[in-house]
Amino acid sequence: MQQLIDSLQKRGILDNSSAGLESLTAPVSAYLGFDPTAPSLHIGHWIGICFLRRLSAYGITPIALVGGATGMIGDPSGKSVERSLLDQEQVLDNSKKIEVALANYLPDIRIVNNADWLGSLSMVDFLRDIGKYFRLGSMLAKDVVKQRVYSEEGISYTEFSYLLLQSYDFAHLFKHHGVVLQCGGSDQWGNITSGIDYIRRKGLGQAFGLTYPLLTDSKGKKIGKTESGTVWLDPELTSPYELFQYFLRLSDQEIPKIARMLTLLDDDEVLALDKRLENDPQAVKRYVAEVIVKDVHGAEGLAQALATTESFFANKGKNITESELAALVQSGVGINVARADVIGKRWLDVVVQLGFCSSKGEARRLIQQRGLYVNQEPLIDEQSVLDGTYLCFDRYILLSQGKKKKQVIDLN
């Protein structure tokens, strides 16, 4: 365990840990949870997946927990307002998809679902076997609760009870699977320590916790969001090309943290990349992006991302062939649109309608600054109308915003 802690400290990704954790000796089992709030994991979850892989590399037996029950409640950690509750059918469907994804990324570890033990828990059992061991004073002192209780939004009893359910998860895994360590992001520390206290109060034994920092940008905002939404791991939602480009668009300052948290590159190589970053930031950024895309989508996904990038950028999109445009649409960077929905409309309206620009104001500003391109030619008149003269091969349109944001429109 000491070797793992030393490595995490060397990488700068150890946020908090329980006293005495370093003295644990093999065999040790640990778990990390994934709530099925969406049908796909996102790039933030990749940190947890890498963390479980890292535990395994240091001889710790990892377990991934899918929150089929807690996903019905919603973790208030890091949230200023209450989540919209998902119905049971949606959570069940999400859980199945998350379990399949985790089995793909973590083929050699156990995956459990807390719906198996929380789903049948009665209210009386909840109050007697769980609620009895928690004191309101300590619960109200938790940062996540404190921030919400005195806010205008407040906190519901449902969300307030979340940490009790997570604590019960830890106790269940401690008792039935020998799990003594819970891991998670820094926003989970309050929930983790509640579980440790619950296990102690129940007389089950000594448990431990370990957290890693949240992945944030220089402004403290969580990394993993774009103008078009969340960066998903499912290639149907975020293509390998889009994932690759997402990392290329990050600032140079964010790459060291990305390399430490989202890759399994060894500690010395990560430190060496820091030095290379000073002299050749683009090469380092591209290398890290390639490593992550290959890890997430395999060699085939990386090849697709690189081929799409080559089609778009090698010759600035000029002389692009019909087959290349078709491949771009297939790779996930294109959208299918009915001709009747856009032909005859102003470009100013079309780019907003397609979600390529967030508003007409943004579109107008880009046009005035010569920053919005149609088939690699700047759009210069905000009153211009989309007609047949803009179609490549009587079917495609290539939209570009600046140097990096591109999209193929298929009017088939």
Curated annotation (Swiss-Prot):
Keywords: Aminoacyl-tRNA synthetase, ATP-binding, Cytoplasm, Ligase, Nucleotide-binding, Protein biosynthesis, RNA-binding
Annotated ATP binding sites: 225
InterPro entries the record matches: aa-tRNA-synth_Ic (IPR002305), Rossmann-like_a/b/a_fold (IPR014729), S4_RNA-bd (IPR002942), S4_RNA-bd_sf (IPR036986), SYY-like_C (IPR054608), Tyr-tRNA-ligase (IPR002307), Tyr-tRNA-ligase_bac-type (IPR024088), Tyr-tRNA-ligase_bac_1 (IPR024107)
One Gene Ontology cellular component: cytosol
EC number: 6.1.1.1
Record carries keyword Membrane: no
Role summary: Catalyzes the attachment of tyrosine to tRNA(Tyr) in a two-step reaction: tyrosine is first activated by ATP to form Tyr-AMP and then transferred to the acceptor end of tRNA(Tyr).
Stated family: Belongs to the class-I aminoacyl-tRNA synthetase family. TyrS type 1 subfamily.
Name this protein carries in UniProt: Tyrosine--tRNA ligase
Organism of provenance: Chlamydia muridarum (strain MoPn / Nigg)
